[in-house]
């Protein structure tokens, strides 16, 4: 059975020691969906939102969040990210925005949490910018899509 890596032998939360691990190229992709009314989505897409460019703001927020994941999640290591990308795609057929984040580095530990944090914060930023016109926006399906590098191997979500 696999054990929790952040719990020591006494059952206490502990930061994993990665000092003996070899650097490898690691990459992770995550996504989130932001469901809203067609009118709210149209406001974003037409550039009529009074707060400005929602997609640009969400993209920057996601990038900033990835870089600060170690400050937000207690046992995450500070990482020297070599790439953070946040892509936003309007999906009018389901009245949603899909947020996809990609994080990459050459290092001793994975970037899954950074990718998940980037997607989550970008989605939260969309909510924040649009809550004045619609309060019942739903953020859903935040998940890891893919990770590569490291000893646990390659993972692709089904």
Swiss-Prot record:
Disulfide bonds: none annotated. One of its GO terms (molecular function) is cyclic pyranopterin monophosphate synthase activity. Substrate binds at residues 75-77, 113-114. Pfam families: MoaC. The active site is at residue 128. Catalyzes the conversion of (8S)-3',8-cyclo-7,8-dihydroguanosine 5'-triphosphate to cyclic pyranopterin monophosphate (cPMP). This is Cyclic pyranopterin monophosphate synthase. It comes from Histophilus somni (strain 129Pt).
């Amino acid at each position: 059975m696999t054990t929790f890596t952040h719990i020591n032998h006494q059952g206490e939360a502990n930061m994993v020691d990665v000092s003996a691990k070899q650097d490898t190229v690691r990459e992770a992709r995550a996504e989130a969906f932001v469901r809203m009314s067609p009118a709210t989505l149209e406001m974003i897409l037409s550039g009529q939102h009074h707060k400005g460019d929602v997609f640009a703001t969400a993209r920057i927020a996601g990038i900033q969040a990835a870089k600060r994941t170690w400050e937000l999640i207690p046992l995450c290591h500070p990482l020297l990210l070599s790439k953070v990308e946040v892509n936003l795609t309007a999906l009018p057929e389901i009245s949603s925005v899909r947020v996809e984040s990609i994080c990459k580095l050459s290092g001793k530990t994975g970037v899954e949490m950074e990718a998940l944090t980037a997607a989550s914060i970008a989605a939260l930023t969309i909510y924040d910018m649009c809550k004045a016109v619609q309060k019942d926006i739903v953020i859903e399906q935040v998940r890891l899509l893919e990770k590569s590098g490291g000893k646990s191997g390659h993972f692709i979500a089904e």
